[in-house]
Amino acid sequence: MPELPEVETSRRGIEPHLVGETILHAVVRNGRLRWPVSDEIHALSDKPILSVQRRAKYLLLELPDGWIIIHLGMSGSLRILPEERPAEKHDHVDLVMSNGKVLRYTDPRRFGAWLWTRELEGHNVLAHLGPEPLSDAFNGAYLREKCAKKKVAIKPWLMDNKLVVGVGNIYASESLFAAGIHPDRLASSLSEKECELLAQAIKAVLLRSIEQGGTTLRDFLQSDGKPGYFAQELQVYGREGEPCRVCGTPILAGKHAQRRTYWCRRCQK
């Protein structure tokens, strides 16, 4: 599933081609996504795009009278293409733009979403979200406060959007390795220093992934069709049995809350 770096990479890739341009019309080839594509998106016509923003794993296209909310789901990606490029099997939604280009949404598993809302505030998919991990609001002190009485393993707690948004399975594993913290540790057992290290590790790992265009393991592509190159820098995720890049110990794998987790037994305590 695309996580924060992949969604932010998509935002940065499409923004220069959309802001200041007008949506001439939408083409919805298959509206049966996680939720049906909103009727207002089917009917789009002559709508300028004012901004392209991101909240958590949602892309937000601001129009004069409302917002398009896009979620990439498990296998979605967005590309900027020439208008004349023929659609392929899994290309479900196009926004045809005034500059001769299309914003094309591709999603083999159809678990993404295209929603419409007049107002962002209070929309059910955006309500009750924690802070952005790259914001000043997310820091060691905040993490310590939220972990202090939490009797759950730190790995699944990091993936809870009420704690912090956008940190999915890949980046939770990578951040815990960078901070030297075992994924089985109870959140409440983390010291003030460990919380500070973990907050900084999360920021550093996410920023590095954004620099590399995100992580492509299967379906994700950047807006120009290229894969994300952070996959080449993964320290533990997907490397079961391979030697740790730091100490040489074989990487271990297990499950936490039904999600695959990877760690080094020597580097993470």
Curated annotation (Swiss-Prot):
UniProt: DNA binding residues: H90, R109, K150
Pfam families, per the entry: Fapy_DNA_glyco, H2TH, zf-FPG_IleRS
UniProt-listed Enzyme Commission number(s): 3.2.2.23, 4.2.99.18
GO MF annotation list: 8-oxo-7,8-dihydroguanine DNA N-glycosylase activity; class I DNA-(apurinic or apyrimidinic site) endonuclease activity; damaged DNA binding; zinc ion binding
InterPro entries in UniProt: DNA_glyclase/AP_lyase_DNA-bd (IPR015886), Formamido-pyr_DNA_Glyclase (IPR020629), FPG_cat (IPR012319), MutM-like_N-ter (IPR035937), Ribosomal_uS13-like_H2TH (IPR010979), Znf_DNA_glyclase/AP_lyase (IPR000214), Znf_FPG/IleRS (IPR010663)
One Gene Ontology term from the biological process aspect of the record: base-excision repair
Cofactor(s) this protein requires: Zn(2+)
Reactions listed under catalytic activity: Hydrolysis of DNA containing ring-opened 7-methylguanine residues, releasing 2,6-diamino-4-hydroxy-5-(N-methyl)formamidopyrimidine; 2'-deoxyribonucleotide-(2'-deoxyribose 5'-phosphate)-2'-deoxyribonucleotide-DNA = a 3'-end 2'-deoxyribonucleotide-(2,3-dehydro-2,3-deoxyribose 5'-phosphate)-DNA + a 5'-end 5'-phospho-2'-deoxyribonucleoside-DNA + H(+)
Active site annotation, chain numbering: P2, E3, K57, R259
Co-factor binding details: Binds 1 zinc ion per subunit.
Zinc finger (FPG-type): 235-269
Keywords for this protein: DNA damage, DNA repair, DNA-binding, Glycosidase, Hydrolase, Lyase, Metal-binding, Multifunctional enzyme, Zinc, Zinc-finger
PANTHER family xrefs: FORMAMIDOPYRIMIDINE-DNA GLYCOSYLASE
Function: Involved in base excision repair of DNA damaged by oxidation or by mutagenic agents. Acts as a DNA glycosylase that recognizes and removes damaged bases. Has a preference for oxidized purines, such as 7,8-dihydro-8-oxoguanine (8-oxoG). Has AP (apurinic/apyrimidinic) lyase activity and introduces nicks in the DNA strand. Cleaves the DNA backbone by beta-delta elimination to generate a single-strand break at the site of the removed base with both 3'- and 5'-phosphates.
Subunit details: Monomer.
Protein family: Belongs to the FPG family.
Name the record gives this protein: Formamidopyrimidine-DNA glycosylase
